[in-house]
């Protein structure tokens, strides 16, 4: 849902999103351009959660007014905060607007604890390694493994079963993971059935 609201492209995106949600009720999350104006619509249409970044992180800072509005609109049980980040000066900062704009908010265990009362889950893309199939961000995962709270899902660079093992080890079995371009269904080499078997055996 990255096209601007009101454009023909947005309407086409919305139509396809609704069709997918109806086909698998409460099985999909929706992200991209989610605001307080459309979040409830996605939940009503069947999304289990909405994923939010830019609406909450405005002008480089956490906009607690918008965050409170979103929680009131859909409930924290339906809200995933996307804290996708890039490294700058040795620290990880949340980025917005298709990962192009740095915020002033650093991703730390303290930040995760501060925001956990507003959300059901965190989604954290390691933007510097995202989509490259060149390995995971071990430093970021190690930091996430120090957090005890709501579920955390890491994304970025997973391209092998060794990477999955590292996520489990470095994340102390507390960090979930997404796999994108490395999966066979997206043109990669990792067979979905083998991934599921590996995870269940682990």
Regions found by a protein language model. Name each.
Residues 16-49, 139-177, 193-195:
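Catalytic cores of alpha/beta
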């Amino acid at each position: 849902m990255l096209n601007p609201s009101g454009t023909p492209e947005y309407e086409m995106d919305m139509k396809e999103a609704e069709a997918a949600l109806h086909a698998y009720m409460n099985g999909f999350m929706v992200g991209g351009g989610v605001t307080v104006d459309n979040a409830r619509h996605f939940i009503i249409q069947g999304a289990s959660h909405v994923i939010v970044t830019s609406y909450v992180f405005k002008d480089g800072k956490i906009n607690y007014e918008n965050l409170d509005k979103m929680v009131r609109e859909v409930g924290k049980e339906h809200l995933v905060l996307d804290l996708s980040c890039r490294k700058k000066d040795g620290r990880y900062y949340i980025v917005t607007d298709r990962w192009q704009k740095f915020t002033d908010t650093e991703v730390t265990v303290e930040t995760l604890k501060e925001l956990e009362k507003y959300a059901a889950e965190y989604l954290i893309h390691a933007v510097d390694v995202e989509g490259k199939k060149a390995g995971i961000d071990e430093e970021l995962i190690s930091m996430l493994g120090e957090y005890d709270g709501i579920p955390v899902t890491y994304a970025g660079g997973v391209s092998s079963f060794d990477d999955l093992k590292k996520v489990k080890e470095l994340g102390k079995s507390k960090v979930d993971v997404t796999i994108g371009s490395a999966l066979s269904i997206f043109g990669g080499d990792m067979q979905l059935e083998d991934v599921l078997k590996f995870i269940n055996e682990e």
